[in-house]
């Protein structure tokens, strides 16, 4: 297992400390991204991971320093060889509009033009986002389980 800190800073980032993100790579080739704060995707793209295997993202919560680069990851990963849907695992909100599903719907609307202009040039499945919400009020909830 290899863990790479792509960012460890706060929302008021600097060149040396962008917002939080961790890439976890397993020996079987699986890759997981935990948070994707603003600025962290530049560090991810600089190490040139195999984007075809980077399709699982876990958002601890929806502050900008934890999800600010989600759409950059989504669209950039699609452009870099991830031709399958991206899966985001994130919290519900105290109301539906404060949860991960609503966040993704809002971001998808905001970036609709960008996504539409790339459609047809790349496999459409890569443009899809699958949302998996977990109940933020639950303790010790399993949010992902595969291969054990």
Positions of PLM-derived features:
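Binuclear metal-dependent hydrolase catalytic cores
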Residues: 1-148
